[in-house]
C-alpha cells in the first residue's frame, strides 16, 4: 500500500487504485487489485503472476501497463521537526542515518548510489519492508533511530497523520 494513492481500507483503495479499476471496468476488462508489500509485488511481476504496478518510480517503467501517466509524485526529504539538517548535495547524506524501504529506488544520481554503498551499515542506511514500512520509518525518525527519509510528500503526510506524529516532522 502507498496511501493516499494505493491503500486497502474500509474507506477505499486509494485514488489511483479506484481510477485504474474504473478505467478497466469501462473498457469491459476485469481487473483485480492485490495489496502486497512492494518487494513482493516486483517479484510477482517477474514471475508473471501480476500484470503491473499502480505506482512506479523512475527506472521501473517496464512494469507500466499504460502509455500515459495518471499522476506524479513529489518526492522530498523529511526530518524531525527539531532537526537542523538540510540537503546540500550528496555529501549531506554522509552526516545522517538514511531510512528507506527495501526495494524502492529513490534517485539515480545521489540517493540510490548512497543506499547501495551503505546498505549493510545501519549507522548510515536502514532499509525495512512490510505493509506499513513508510509509517514505521516515520516513527523511527521521530524516535531518533534514523535521521532522514526521502519519499512522496502526500504519502508522508498521510502516514505521519495515521501514526499521530505529523507535527513531529518537517
Provide a role label for each language-model segment.
Residues 1-63, 130:
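Extracytoplasmic small-molecule ligand-binding "clamshell" domains
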Residues 20, 41-44, 134-140, 146, ...:
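Short, hydrophobic alpha-helical packing/hinge segments within bilobed ligand-binding/sensory domains
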Residues 20-29, 68-70, 103-131, 138, ...:
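Ligand-binding cleft/hinge of the Venus flytrap
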Residues 65-78, 91-94, 170:
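Short Pro/Gly-enriched coil loops immediately N-terminal to beta-strands
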Residues 1-2, 57-59, 80-83, 101-104, ...:
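Solvent-exposed coil/turn segments that connect beta secondary-structure elements
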Residues 1-7, 90-108:
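Short loop->beta-strand "edge-of-pocket" segments that line small-molecule binding or catalytic clefts
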Amino acid at each position: 500500500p502507498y496511501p493516499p494513492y494505493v491503500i486497502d481500507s474500509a474507506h477505499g483503495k486509494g485514488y489511483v487504485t479506484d481510477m485504474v479499476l474504473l478505467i478497466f471496468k469501462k473498457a469491459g476488462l476485469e481487473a483485480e487489485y492485490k495489496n502486497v508489500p512492494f518487494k513482493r509485488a516486483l517479484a510477482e511481476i517477474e514471475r508473471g503472476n501480476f500484470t503491473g504496478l499502480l505506482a512506479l518510480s523512475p527506472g521501473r517503467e517496464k512494469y507500466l501497463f499504460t502509455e500515459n501517466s495518471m499522476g506524479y509524485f513529489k518526492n522530498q526529504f523529511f526530518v524531525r521537526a527539531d532537526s537542523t539538517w538540510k540537503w546540500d548535495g550528496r555529501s549531506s547524506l554522509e552526516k545522517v542515518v538514511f531510512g528507506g524501504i527495501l526495494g524502492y529506488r529513490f534517485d539515480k544520481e545521489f540517493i540510490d548510489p548512497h543506499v547501495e554503498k551503505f546498505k549493510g551499515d545501519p549507522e548510515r542506511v536502514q532499509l525495512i519492508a512490510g505493509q506499513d514500512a513508510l509509517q514505521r520509518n516515520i516513527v523511527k525518525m521521530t524516535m531518533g533511530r534514523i535521521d532522514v527519509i526521502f519519499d512522496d510528500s502526500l504519502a508522508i503526510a498521510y502516514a505521519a497523520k495515521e501514526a499521530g506524529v505529523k507535527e513531529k516532522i518537517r
